[in-house]
Every structure is written in C-alpha cells, then in structure tokens.
C-alpha cells in the first residue's frame, strides 16, 4: 500500500459513479490494486461491479457494498494523495450511508498499512478485531498481494475497523458482519464461511 499523508483541504466534487465511468474504474483499480479483483476475508470480488463514489475530475474512487444495516468500504484511493480527496470521498460516503439508514461502516486492512491505520483512526474508526494469518490465506487467492509492507513490516494479518454512523450506534464490538457466523479464534480466521465480497485487505491506499 502506498503511504497516506495528512490531507490538505480539498475542493473535490464527489458524485455517484455512472455507467460511463466503468472503463475508467477498471483502469484505476488496475493501477492502484494490480487487478480489477480485490481479495479480503477469504473471498474474491470483481470490484468494478460495486457501487462507488467518484471525486472529480476522476481523481479519486471509493467503492463499497451494503451488508444489511452495515456497509463495507472496499477501496479508497486518490490521486495525488494527501490533498484531502480521500477525506472528501469518505465523508461523502458516510453521509450518504447514514441518510440511507446504515448504522456502521467497516473496512479491512493489512497489519502493515500504518499510514492508512492512522488515517482511519483519526476519522472516527475503531479497531474491532485482528485475524492472524488472514493475509497469508488471501495471498493464495491473489499472489500479487505484497509480502512486505511499509517500513519493512511483513504482511500476515488482517485488521477490521468500524465507524459508527449514528450517536446511538454500537461501536462494532460484536465484530464485522462477515465474522459473526464463525467466531472461533482457534483457527486464526474468525470469519464467516458464507460467500461475501470484500476489499484487497485494506479499505484504502493513496488517500
């Protein structure tokens, strides 16, 4: 994952992705994720099929999916980084989801994406759980997932983060939707065996 700096102010206009954006989204995902597929909590998804928000003029993308009353941020990227575009996308998405009645926004990231961890913790996310060895498992599905992350940190584990979208919403202590059907930590996975789509082990990079 690329480093994430603290953003400057942004005047980016954020809008829902349209059918005309499909080719650009595929190209953007290939540039930032190495493929149009992304992998997380043991599943592979065609990210171009997800709903998304676009920061004009096509300099940022946030893709997501609904999971009942919850939602998952799948990818978040901005070009160039550290200009506030990622923050603009994230805040636009949380406003939209809150207005739609969504209660929590989740994301998953690698243990070595320290810049992204700082970015999200400063924007209201809290750590919910760690899945030891989950990145090693995901690498079997997508071998291009890096072995080494920022600062030479080996990438082995997935971190789930949660942001409550309302003042009375529980903070996600029960774990993300994909883990609730199977929460035995003894196997190191802590995730549902039911098919669920997700992100490339990091709700974001380059924001």
Can you name each region flagged by the protein language model?
Residues 1-20, 159, 165-195, 206-207:
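Conserved N-terminal entry element of GNAT/NAT acetyltransferase domains
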Residues 16-83, 87-91, 96, 164-165, ...:
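Acetyl-CoA-dependent GNAT
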Residues 50-52, 155-160:
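Short hydrophobic/aromatic beta-strand or adjacent loop that forms the aromatic wall/cage
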Residues 87, 112-150, 155:
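Conserved active-site alpha-helix within GNAT-family acetyltransferase domains
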Residues 97-111, 115:
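Conserved GNAT acetyl-CoA-binding A-motif
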